[in-house]
UniProtKB/Swiss-Prot annotation:
One of its GO terms (molecular function) is DNA binding. This is Centromere DNA-binding protein complex CBF3 subunit A. It is found in: Nucleus; Chromosome, Centromere; Cytoplasm, Cytoskeleton, Microtubule organizing center, Spindle pole body. It comes from Saccharomyces cerevisiae (strain ATCC 204508 / S288c). Transmembrane segments: none annotated.
Length: 956
């Protein structure tokens, strides 16, 4: 009872206060609000909101009063909202901050205190404008509505940026372990670009395409802060090119209200900006993934192909295709799949991982606009002045400038007009058109007939293509074995020259040529620290870092870059020149052989010969190219030293040359000679002579300069060394090419001899009929199937079987009398001989066969032991008596052969892959032929006498 009375008294008191406030005039309420502030705070607030009013007048948001009265405040008509306050902050505080003036006001403040001061000022201005909104409401201003959550997100954004930069500075000062400072974005991205990750689970990451698919999702999370559910809704048609900022890719996320599903409820616009570092650039990663997705990996997998924009009349096609491919073209990968990916990758990179940080909603996100605010704020009639100077507008492409910058790890405290660095080596147009060539095809033919979504998609792909090619030289420099470079177009001389021209200036410098991230440049622009982020280093990076002359450069060396290298002492300079010369020889040798092998490929493609022979030659050329690439890239100067030490005749010649020197005692006091050795595998006399000549020339140079001072001696040695290097490189390249060409000529001659021998043998067999047994030792047993195209099954295929012809139908018993299409069916004479011969020696199955390949060969290859009969021909003859002693074995092998024929004829698989799949299925059945046959018979019985679906079962 007592509590009820107290509640009624409080309620009556509140009602009395409300009645008193209603009875008060607007002037009294205004004065009451002003009196609630301390005098100093009231003065600060008035200063800030007076500046806001002047800014509104300057931008023509409100009219300027005719009397130019500063003290007159239009409380009743003044528009004030969270979006306008944000615009005001961007124009006057965030981007228009003058460091010179600030230093005068805060002379004793260091950088950290200045940042704190900026946040404190930001909060004070927001507080003053919130107070101004209350004053406007007193005057019944209908436009005084402030979204406090929006302004809280602005404060949170800048606090996050400054705190993160402060943490980097603090850790850098107090922590000697640079690994602690590494952001997950950098470490994960660099390691997922690396193709040589032997310890990363192949269950999830078999190819570079799967790594890039994960990396696109990871970088979308890092830059856009979207949950996995939100990322899964991004489609090709959702991404547009920025109209104001052509470097930005815009994602316009629209959500609809539950009541009106056709009417937009809220808008959220997000931006992806390019990065200087190629490995963390989301545009480069997306372009690389799409390249492998559209065109596939040669000899590994086929691509989906470029979208058919001619079929996208209403723009629905691009709205159905997700940015990442799941099991089908129109599905995004499942959340469970990517959850396993994230766990595996973070464990591999030794980074802490919390699932909610990458799959749930993030606290720091781009602002969301309701439909009315979005339409009103960006109305040209309301804010017309900024349209006259769009480059200075705080909301380019309707995205707040500071959100766009900070979300992309860039400082917002710059001017609006600050542009990204221009590429000193822009991609040549003749190379651009070779990447995603469909872009130019669509633009040349019926571009106007495409839907607007299709045209926007082509504009987007153009920007991605240019960014991709611009960063490709650096990717090639770090990871030349990446699957992207399996595409033959990147091996031609034009691309190789562009790659070399863009990266050659960085050779020898301990500093990277591109920026990393704000706050991390001081640490990770050093190549040694950057390489240390790799869990498994590629061979060429391991070699380069071990020969880096300066692993810990000073601050002066970091700023001066390659110029500092000229001041190194003689030993370091000699090592540097030696390494650069060796790398140059490697590059020239590799590029020249790639050109040579491409010419051979074209020649053999034009020659008239049997398809299987041409395929074999091209296959051998490709194997030779791969082997050559690996050997040249993995070769080191030390390998040449070891080769000469192990070669006794060359050692003796070197000793003779050393003993013939004019002054042995003087020579023993000199520093160790630099010897540039041949990279060729041969040990001919020319390499020894060149090495000896180089030694004699070096001795004569040093003898002539013995009496001069050290500086003159160094400069003369450098000039002489340069000339000798040029001469030596030319001689070594010609020697190496000559030797390799001789070896290649021998291989080609042997190959052609073998092909001619086989062809002659076949002609003789056709002429002589049954006498083929005499020449059977000249060739390998052949299966009679035509070579099918490689459809990219995800299994390693042992390239053993070589067959010709194609099966027409599956194998059946001789009762069915169904013939099979072969290229060399036995002649009637052979059938007669077979019948007479089987009376003498009965046909039998070989019980010692222990491989699928052996079973297939026995089934279709004529056997001289049984009058050139095979299982297939015996079935055609109608004689079943030979099966009496091996009926169970025959039925067992028949099931296996039927599955093999199904793979070749119905699934259109390459015969090598078909054999390999059978072997893998056999391994799953404990390696037993009988268990395999039983499994196959059961599958056919359960699936309407068909093997349909078995491949899908195996792949899962």
């Amino acid at each position: 009872m007592r509590s009820s009375i107290l509640f009624l008294l409080k309620l009556m008191k509140i009602m009395d206060v409300q009645q008193q406030q209603e009875a008060m005039s607007s002037e009294d309420r205004f004065q009451e609000l002003v009196d609630s502030l301390k005098p100093r705070t009231a003065h600060q607030y008035k200063t800030y909101y007076t500046k806001y009013i002047q800014w509104c007048q300057l931008n023509q948001i409100i009219p300027t009063p005719e009397d130019n009265s500063v003290n007159s405040v239009p409380y009743k008509d003044l528009p004030i909202s969270a979006e306008l306050i944000h615009w005001f902050l961007l124009d006057t505080l965030i981007t228009d901050d003058k460091p010179g003036e600030k230093r005068e006001e805060t002379e004793d403040l260091d950088e950290e205190e200045e940042n704190s001061f900026k946040i404190a000022t930001l909060k004070k201005i927001i507080g003053s404008l919130n107070f101004l909104s209350k004053l406007c409401k007193v005057h019944e201003n209908p436009n005084a509505n402030i979204d406090t959550k929006y302004l809280e997100s602005v404060t949170k954004l800048h606090t996050h940026w400054i705190d993160s930069q402060k943490a980097i500075t603090t850790n850098e000062t107090n922590n000697t372990n640079t690994q602690v400072l590494c952001p997950p974005l950098l470490k994960v991205s660099l390691n997922l670009w690396n193709p040589e990750t032997n310890h990363l689970s192949e269950k999830f990451f078999k190819t570079c395409s799967e790594k890039l698919r994960f990396l696109v999702d990871f970088q979308l999370r890092s830059y856009l802060n979207l949950s996995f559910e939100e990322r899964s809704k991004i489609r090709f048609g959702s991404l547009k090119l920025g109209k104001r900022d052509r470097d930005a890719i815009i994602y316009h996320k629209v959500t609809h209200s539950a009541e009106k599903k056709d009417t937009p409820g809220h808008h959220q616009l997000l931006a992806l900006l390019p990065q200087d570092c190629p490995f963390i650039c989301p545009q480069t990663t997306l372009a690389a993934y799409l390249y492998l997705r559209f065109y596939g990996i040669p000899s590994v997998s086929k691509g989906d192909g470029f979208p058919n924009l001619n079929a996208d009349e209403n723009g629905s096609l691009l709205q159905d295709i997700p940015i990442l491919r799941g099991k089908s073209l129109t599905t995004y990968p499942r959340e469970e799949t990517f959850s396993n990916y994230y766990t595996t990758v973070f464990r591999y990179c030794h980074l802490p991982y919390k699932r909610r940080e990458y799959f749930n909603k993030c606290n720091l996100v781009y602002p969301t606009w309701d439909e009315d605010t979005f339409r009103t704020f960006f109305n040209e009639e309301n804010h017309g002045n900024w349209l006259e100077q769009p480059e200075a507008f705080a909301f380019p492409d309707k995205i707040p400038f500071d959100f766009k910058k900070i979300m992309n790890f860039k400082s917002p405290y710059t001017s609006y007009s600050t542009n990204a660095k221009k590429d000193p080596f822009p991609p040549p147009k003749d190379l651009l058109v070779q990447i995603f060539p469909e872009i130019d095809e669509y633009k040349r033919h019926d571009y106007e007939g495409l839907s607007q979504n299709s045209r926007d998609f082509l504009d987007l792909m153009e920007v991605l293509r240019e960014r991709f090619l611009s960063n490709l030289p650096w990717i090639y420099k770090f990871f030349p074995n990446h699957d992207i470079f399996q595409d033959p177009i990147f091996g031609n001389s034009d691309f190789q020259s562009y790659f070399n021209d863009k990266t050659i200036h960085s050779k020898g410098s301990p500093i990277l040529s591109f920026d990393i991230l704000p706050g991390f440049n001081k640490i990770y622009k050093n190549k040694t620290n950057f390489y240390s982020l790799l869990i498994e280093r590629p061979s060429q990076l391991t070699f380069a870092s071990s020969h880096n002359p300066d692993t810990h450069p000073t601050q002066k060396q970091e700023s001066e870059g390659p110029l500092q290298m000229s001041q190194l002492d003689t030993t370091q300079l000699n090592e540097l020149l030696k390494q650069q010369s060796f790398e140059y020889v490697q590059f020239q040798t590799l590029s020249n052989f790639q050109i040579l092998l491409s010419v051979f490929n074209k020649i053999f493609e034009k020659l008239e010969m049997k398809k299987s022979s041409r395929g074999y030659i091209l296959h051998q050329l490709n194997l030779f190219k791969i082997t050559l690439d690996e050997r040249i890239k993995k070769s080191k100067i030390d390998d040449a030293d070891k080769f000469i030490r192990d070669n006794q005749p060359i050692k003796k010649e070197e000793n003779i040359v050393n003993e013939d020197g004019p002054n042995t005692s003087r020579r023993t006091k000199r520093p160790k000679q630099i010897r540039l050795l041949s990279i060729a595998d041969s040990s001919d006399e020319s390499s020894t002579e060149d090495s000896n000549v180089f030694k004699k020339d070096g001795e004569s140079i040093e003898d002539g300069a013995y009496g001069e001072n050290e500086d003159e001696n160094d400069s003369e040695m450098q000039e002489q060394l340069k000339s000798m290097i040029n001469e030596l490189i030319n001689s070594k390249i010609s020697t190496f090419l000559r030797d390799q060409m001789d070896q290649f000529e021998l291989k080609i001659n042997a190959l052609l001899d073998k092909i001619l021998e086989e062809k002659v043998t076949r002609i003789i067999e056709q002429k002589l009929g049954s006498h083929t047994g005499k020449f059977s030792t000249l060739k390998r047993p052949q299966l009679y199937m035509t070579e099918e195209h490689n459809v990219g099954f995800d299994m390693e295929v042992p390239k053993k079987l070589r067959t010709s012809g194609k099966y027409a139908e599956t194998v059946k018993d001789n009762d069915d009398h169904q013939a099979m299409s072969t290229t060399a069916s036995p002649s009637p004479e052979q059938d007669q001989e077979a019948k007479s011969y089987t009376d003498e020696q009965e046909f039998m199955l070989d019980k010692s066969i222990d491989s699928i390949e052996g079973i297939i060969l026995e089934w279709f290859t004529p056997n001289a032991k049984y009058a050139n009969q095979c299982v297939h021909s015996m079935n055609k003859s109608g004689n079943k008596s030979w099966r009496a002693n091996c009926e169970a074995l025959y039925k067992e092998r028949k099931s296996i052969v039927e599955f093999y024929i199904y793979l070749v004829n119905h699934e259109s698989l390459d015969r090598y892959k078909a054999v390999d799949i059978c072997e893998k299925l056999r391994d799953q059945n404990e390696g037993s032929f009988s268990r395999l046959a039983k499994f196959l018979r059961k599958w056919r019985h359960d699936h309407q006498n068909s093997f349909d679906g078995l491949l899908v079962y195996l792949s899962n």
